[in-house]
Amino acid sequence: MNPNCARCGKIVYPTEKVNCLDKFWHKACFHCETCKMTLNMKNYKGYEKKPYCNAHYPKQSFTMVADTPENLRLKQQSELQSQVRYKEEFEKNKGKGFSVVADTPELQRIKKTQDQISNIKYHEEFEKSRMGPSGGEGIEPERREAQDSSSYRRPTEQQQPQPHHIPTSAPVYQQPQQQQVTPSYGGYKEPAAPVSIQRSAPGGGGKRYRAVYDYSAADEDEVSFQDGDTIVNVQQIDDGWMYGTVERTGDTGMLPANYVEAI
């Protein structure tokens, strides 16, 4: 159904319809309220939903107010009220000025990188505290660390000389574990039984972990591993670091605890 003109009230057909100021007009009826000049969509100006030309467009006028003591008092009172409201809003919203951030893959990558950097810095501070201020105190920890690493890499070498000091009654004690090995007393064949037992003991008795991320060593006493590698002979140093051997490569050293999970 065709609408009525806002000026004359007659029906407006599509060929002569002007849709402007939320109303419908005839092209001839769309003129200035003051001078009756015909307007179009480019040169009209609307005021209270009525068309005006540029010359007769109503202009806002401002009234000058004298700075009387009463007006100054009201102005000062308004400013004080504004400050009080601002302070109330500030105290009310204090501590709430944060926004929820979506957990995107990019943010997860940045978080993972920051965790690695913090772990490296923590490791550096830990090593500096172990080295000590003087040179003599720093040498001993290095020697102890070298001894510890050698003991972790070659657990059998630390205990291998023990069978040579076993008394003559030791072969009798070891024979039931070897399922009736030849009882010939050679002095060198029978001590091999405790050596084999000691090599298998750390692998079965020590803790085993599986890597869940790839990690590249950032220091000489760390080890590199890949996702899915098995870490054996694991010992907990602190909440952030462990000590163990990568079964695939045989390397022994420190590794971050948040990169592995227990098997």
From Swiss-Prot:
Positions of modified residues (N6-succinyllysine): K112
Ribonucleoprotein listed as a keyword: no
Tissue-by-tissue expression: Expressed in a wide range of tissues (but not the heart or skeletal muscle), the expression is specific for certain actin-rich cell types within these tissues. Expression is prominent in the cortical regions of ion-transporting duct cells in the pancreas, in the salivary parotid gland and in certain F-actin-rich cells in the distal tubule/collecting duct. In primary cultures of gastric fibroblasts, expression is mainly within the tips of lamellipodia and at the leading edges of membrane ruffles.
PANTHER family xref list: LASP, LIM AND SH3 DOMAIN PROTEIN 1
Location of Phosphothreonine modifications: T68, T104
UniProt PTM comment: Phosphorylated.
Alphabetical keyword list: Acetylation, Actin-binding, Cytoplasm, Cytoskeleton, Ion transport, LIM domain, Metal-binding, Methylation, Phosphoprotein, Repeat, SH3 domain, Transport, Zinc
Organism lineage: Eukaryota, Metazoa, Chordata, Craniata, Vertebrata
Nebulin repeats by residue range: 64-95, 97-131
Regions of compositional bias (Polar residues) in chain numbering: 148-162
Keyword Hydrolase among UniProt keywords: no
SUPFAM superfamilies, alphabetized: Glucocorticoid receptor-like (DNA-binding domain), SH3-domain
Subcellular location, principal: cytoplasm
N-acetylmethionine modified-residue sites: M1
Annotated GO CC locations: cortical actin cytoskeleton; cytoplasm; focal adhesion; postsynapse
Membrane spanning residue stretches: none
Spans annotated as Disordered: 122-207
Top-rank taxon, per record: Eukaryota
Assembly with partners or alone: Interacts with F-actin. Interacts with ANKRD54. Interacts with KBTBD10.
A GO molecular function held by the record: metal ion binding
Cell location: Cytoplasm, Cell cortex; Cytoplasm, Cytoskeleton
SMART domains for the chain: LIM (SM00132), NEBU (SM00227), SH3 (SM00326)
Modified residues (N6-acetyllysine): K42
Function as written in the Swiss-Prot or TrEMBL entry: Plays an important role in the regulation of dynamic actin-based, cytoskeletal activities. Agonist-dependent changes in LASP1 phosphorylation may also serve to regulate actin-associated ion transport activities, not only in the parietal cell but also in certain other F-actin-rich secretory epithelial cell types.
Organism: Rattus norvegicus
Name this protein carries in UniProt: LIM and SH3 domain protein 1
LIM zinc-binding domain residues: 3-63
